[in-house]
């Protein structure tokens, strides 16, 4: 598997073969030199310090003309006796130095520089060594010949001072030093500059450009820290391309205009960034694990609750007839569906948290491992690691809690089924209620039998009473309960502004309504009705806090359940017109049901504290009426 993983990518290899070793970009007008390597025409021409092959014929002609001129000059010098004078070493050295300076000036003025020239130092060193050897050779010969000429001159002067030396014995002019042209890749040298166009390679490069507009970057970084292109140490980091480069790459066209920093600096910077992500990831993981444990406990509690309720349902239905067995099966089915839906939500939340925990664990381990690495291993895919660390977001599960009072709990099941069978609902627990006129707000009008209430046309003159509501259009039932189970039904008419429920005895009836609403203790009924139409859905908070009222009602088209500690928007499947209110004093439960379909609406868990609890009614708008069912 490791061998397969290290196999180079053919596409990447093809891209690399189409890149010039001098400019590190795709070939432009590629040419081949004598050793077979290919380069851009402009790059190799600048490297060799001359013009391209097209001007070679003209240069050859100029060289031939110069040779002819030199021969004529030699003949002229020989004829004039110039060679009779011994050559001085300093004269010859001066000529050689001038010639070397001219060649160097021409060479550097030809535009050599830019990318990858540092990698060509060996070319200049070899040429300088060859020139020095040739110069020493010629200077040595000149010195020897000069000595011989001096001896010969002395002998001739002794014989005949007027006799001239034979020009044939004079030193011939030194040949011009030859220049070598070296391949920048294989270092092979050539006596003449020669290259030819490579049309097939040019066509291939055009195809590669269409596939990949820019040369690949990934192959330059390896585990050994050596640039595979230039065999130089990777000591720099390009912040634009986000890759390690060598000093030769820094001078190339690809990176020359980019921001480059030392590799060690960026390694330390990225290490610090990774360390900065470790602690937040650890905290996220701990938070997810805590929520996961909490969800698992809730699932266990829900399962236990389901088992206990199913056992209670089975016990109640065991005493009923065949008809009750059918009802039992139907209710058990609905109950299981309800619990399975809750279990599904809880299980899904636990699974999501488990997935988040696993993901965070993997990412945390990766970040810790990467933060301990150094050099190039740390930088590989570092941006992707940062993105995944930064994109991690804690997704808490949906906040929900199982309703402790299910719509078909055992304390209501028997009475509901008996009522359905006999069209009566547990007469032992059913209450025949009436309204208490001493508690009614002056804007409320009670029916003669005290079973109905609505808004009056105008405010009524009623005697003062300590129990009377003076700040809100409410009325209580005449009967209160301190123990036992009790059930009553209420019929509501109109669609706006009503509430039914229960209130504890120790309520304050005279307080002004706080920020949640306004008082209606004065003014006529019309202004009261207009004011109540602008009220919020819920009961005023000051009223609820001091009265301990638990009620379900509407304002406009929306249903909601309201108490001093709870405010819940409701979405019943059907809009109930007849409510059943079920009070279990000892259990501290107050349940609301659709009396026509026995559908559960809402259940409060309340603390009655040994006080009497009275039925509670509220009317807010004209056209709304409440009637107690016998």
Curated annotation (Swiss-Prot):
Q: What subcellular locations does the record give?
A: Cytoplasm; Nucleus
Matching entries from Pfam families are given as:
PRY, SPRY, zf-B_box, zf-C3HC4_4
Q: Where is the B30.2/SPRY domain?
A: 413-630
Q: Which reaction does it catalyse?
A: S-ubiquitinyl-[E2 ubiquitin-conjugating enzyme]-L-cysteine + [acceptor protein]-L-lysine = [E2 ubiquitin-conjugating enzyme]-L-cysteine + N(6)-ubiquitinyl-[acceptor protein]-L-lysine
Briefly state the modifications made to the protein after translation: Auto-ubiquitinated.
Please state what the protein is called: E3 ubiquitin-protein ligase TRIM41
| Function comment | E3 ligase that plays essential roles in innate antiviral response. Directly binds to influenza A virus or vesicular stomatitis virus nucleoproteins and targets them for ubiquitination and proteasomal degradation, thereby limiting viral infections. Activates the innate antiviral response by catalyzing monoubiquitination of CGAS, thereby activating CGAS. Also involved in innate antiviral response by mediating 'Lys-63'-linked polyubiquitylation of BCL10 which in turn hubs NEMO for activation of NF-kappa-B and IRF3 pathways.
The residue ranges flagged as biased composition, category Acidic residues, are 51-75, 148-166
Q: Which SUPFAM superfamilies match?
A: B-box zinc-binding domain, Concanavalin A-like lectins/glucanases, RING/U-box
Q: Which organism is it from?
A: Mus musculus (Mouse)
Cross-referenced InterPro entries, in alphabetical order?
A: B30.2/SPRY, B30.2/SPRY_sf, Butyrophylin_SPRY, ConA-like_dom_sf, PRY, SPRY_dom, TRIM/RBCC, TRIM41_SPRY_PRY
> Any idea what a deletion of this gene does?
Deletion mutant impairs the production of inflammatory cytokines and type I interferons in macrophages after infection with both DNA and RNA viruses.
Zn-finger region bounds: RING-type: 20-61
Q: Name one GO cellular component term.
A: fibrillar center
What family is reported? Belongs to the TRIM/RBCC family.
Sorted alphabetically, which PROSITE patterns does this protein's record hold? B302_SPRY, ZF_BBOX, ZF_RING_1, ZF_RING_2
Glycyl lysine isopeptide (Lys-Gly) (interchain with G-Cter in SUMO2) crosslink location in chain: 256
GO MF annotation: an example: zinc ion binding
Q: Which residues are recorded with the post-translational modification Phosphoserine?
A: 447
Question: Whom does it interact with, and what assembly results?
Answer: Interacts with PRKCA. Interacts with NOD2. Interacts with TRIM17; this interaction prevents TRIM41 activity on ZSCAN2.
Positions of the UniProt region annotated as Disordered: 51-97, 148-176, 503-535
Binding residues annotated for Zn(2+), in chain numbering: 227, 230, 249, 255
Q: Which keywords appear in this protein's UniProt record, sorted alphabetically?
A: Coiled coil, Cytoplasm, Isopeptide bond, Metal-binding, Nucleus, Phosphoprotein, Transferase, Ubl conjugation, Ubl conjugation pathway, Zinc, Zinc-finger
**Gene Ontology biological process terms in this record:** cellular response to lipopolysaccharide; cellular response to muramyl dipeptide; defense response to virus; positive regulation of type I interferon-mediated signaling pathway; protein monoubiquitination
Q: Which residues carry this modification: Phosphothreonine?
A: 85
Cite the EC number: 2.3.2.27
């Amino acid at each position: 598997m490791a061998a397969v993983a290290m196999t180079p990518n053919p596409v990447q290899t093809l891209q690399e073969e189409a890149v010039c070793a001098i400019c590190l970009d795709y070939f432009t007008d590629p040419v081949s030199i004598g050793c077979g390597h290919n380069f851009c025409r402009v790059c190799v021409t600048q490297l060799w310090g001359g013009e391209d092959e097209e001007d070679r014929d003209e240069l050859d002609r100029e060289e031939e003309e110069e040779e002819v001129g030199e021969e004529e000059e030699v003949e002229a010098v020989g004829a004039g006796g110039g060679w009779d004078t011994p050559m001085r070493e300093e004269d010859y050295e001066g000529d050689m130095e001038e010639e070397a300076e001219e060649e160097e000036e021409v060479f550097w003025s030809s535009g050599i520089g830019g990318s990858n020239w540092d990698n060509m130092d060996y070319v200049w060193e070899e040429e300088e060594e060859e020139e020095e050897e040739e110069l020493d050779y010629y200077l040595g010969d000149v010195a020897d010949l000069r000595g011989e000429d001096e001896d010969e001159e002395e002998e001739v002067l002794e014989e005949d001072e007027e006799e001239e030396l034979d020009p044939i014995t004079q030193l011939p002019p030194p040949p011009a030093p030859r220049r070598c042209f070296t391949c920048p890749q294989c270092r092979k040298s050539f006596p003449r500059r020669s290259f030819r166009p490579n049309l097939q390679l040019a066509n291939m490069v055009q195809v590669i450009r269409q596939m990949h507009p820019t040369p690949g970057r990934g192959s330059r970084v390896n585990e050994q820290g050596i640039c595979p292109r230039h065999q130089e140490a990777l000591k720099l980091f390009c912040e634009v391309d986000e890759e390690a480069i060598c000093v030769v790459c820094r001078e190339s066209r690809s990176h020359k205009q980019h921001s480059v920093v030392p590799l060690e600096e960026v390694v330390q910077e990225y290490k610090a960034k990774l360390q900065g992500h470790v602690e937040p990831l650890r905290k996220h993981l701990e938070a997810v694990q805590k929520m996961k444990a909490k969800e698992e406990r809730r699932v266990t509690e829900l399962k236990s609750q389901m088992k206990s309720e199913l056992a209670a349902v089975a016990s109640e239905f065991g005493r009923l007839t065949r008809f009750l067995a059918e009802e039992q099966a139907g209710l058990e089915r609905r109950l299981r569906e309800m619990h399975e839906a809750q279990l599904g939500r809880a299980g899904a939340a636990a699974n999501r948290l488990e997935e988040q925990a696993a993901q965070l664990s993997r990412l945390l381990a990766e970040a810790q491992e990467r933060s301990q690495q150094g050099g190039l291993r740390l930088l590989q895919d570092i941006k992707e690691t940062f993105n995944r660390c930064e994109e991690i977001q804690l997704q808490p599960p949906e906040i929900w809690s199982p309703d402790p009072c299910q719509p078909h709990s055992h304390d209501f099941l028997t009475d509901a089924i008996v009522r359905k069978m006999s069209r009566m609902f547990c007469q032992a627990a059913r209450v025949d209620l009436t309204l208490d006129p001493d508690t009614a707000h002056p804007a409320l009008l009670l029916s003669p039998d005290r079973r109905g209430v609505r808004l009056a046309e105008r405010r009524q003159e009623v005697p003062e009473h300590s129990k009377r509501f003076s700040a809100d259009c409410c009325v209580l039932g005449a009967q209160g309960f301190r123990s036992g189970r009790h059930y009553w039904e209420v019929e509501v008419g109109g669609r706006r502004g009503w509430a039914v429920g229960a209130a504890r005895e120790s309520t304050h009836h005279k307080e002004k309504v706080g920020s949640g609403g306004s008082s209606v203790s004065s003014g006529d009924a019309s202004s009261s009705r207009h004011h109540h139409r602008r009220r919020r859905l819920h009961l005023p908070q000051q009223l609820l806090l001091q009265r301990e009222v638990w009620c379900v009602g509407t304002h406009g088209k929306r249903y909601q359940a309201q108490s001093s500690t709870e405010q819940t928007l409701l979405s019943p499947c059907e809009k109930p017109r007849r409510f059943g209110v079920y009070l279990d004093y000892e259990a501290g439960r107050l349940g609301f049901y659709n009396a026509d379909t026995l559908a559960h609406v809402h259940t409060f868990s309340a603390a009655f504290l040994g006080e009497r609890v009275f039925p509670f009614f509220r009317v807010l708008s004209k056209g709304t009426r409440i009637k107690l069912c016998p």
